[in-house]
Design a protein with these regions (language model features):
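Active-site acidic/histidine proton-transfer and metal-coordination neighborhood
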Residues: 90-193
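Alpha/beta catalytic barrel-like cores
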Residues: 1-111, 120-131, 146-149
Length: 193
């Protein structure tokens, strides 16, 4: 049986309801300064969660799966931006939206997944890349928990091996060692494509 799904955005919702994701680039953040940028990031994050909620409802109405956008949280995992989820002034409201989405996902049996960006390489021979990848994967695991996804391959975090440097046995060893650094919320969901 073929199962349809939606990847990140819905052109229909964008056209009909003007619902679209909002981002902030690091250069904008720097121009504004941290104190001015943080409320804007918080507002855009709230918008992104509300758009996600509407897309998930659309997917549920059609029996589709949904691949969650990796851009819900502008700059949250970017090390130079230096802020945490709970630093956003509206984090309590964000938690309420997350809970609403999680309840909907569970009540309607909506299958969700995510696919962190291609720069995430667990088998890299560059320790900085592996460190950043683990941070990104942990963020995605946290996000999938908040969205109500179960900790299984039914709610996958999908990545590519994305390296060809070295002997296949060495690549496998590096991947396994980096995988061991990940928490259960990542390990239980990680799928390699």
């Amino acid at each position: 049986m073929v199962k349809y799904g939606l990847c990140c955005i819905s052109n229909v919702l964008t056209e009909q309801r003007k619902l679209k994701f909002s981002i902030m680039r690091y250069n904008q953040y720097c121009k504004l300064g941290h104190d001015a940028a943080l409320p804007i990031i918080a507002e855009r994050t709230e918008n992104n969660l509300l758009v996600t909620e509407q897309i998930i409802k659309l997917c549920a109405s059609k029996g589709w799966t949904y691949r969650v956008s990796s851009c819900l949280f502008p700059l949250l995992t970017y090390k130079h931006a230096k802020f945490e989820y709970h630093d956003m002034p509206n984090w309590v409201k964000l938690d309420e939206i997350f809970l609403r989405i999680a309840n909907f996902v569970c009540d309607n049996n909506v299958r969700i997944s995510c696919h962190p960006d291609q720069f995430n390489v667990l088998a890299s021979n560059n320790p900085d890349v592996v460190d950043r990848t683990v941070i990104e994967l942990e963020h995605h695991g946290w996000m999938m928990d908040k969205l109500g996804g179960d900790r299984s391959h039914n709610t996958p975090i999908n990545i590519h091996p994305a390296t060809s440097k070295g002997d296949p046995a060495d690549i496998s060893k590096r991947f396994y060692e980096a995988f061991q650094r990940c928490s259960p919320r990542v390990q239980s969901r990680l799928v390699v494509e």
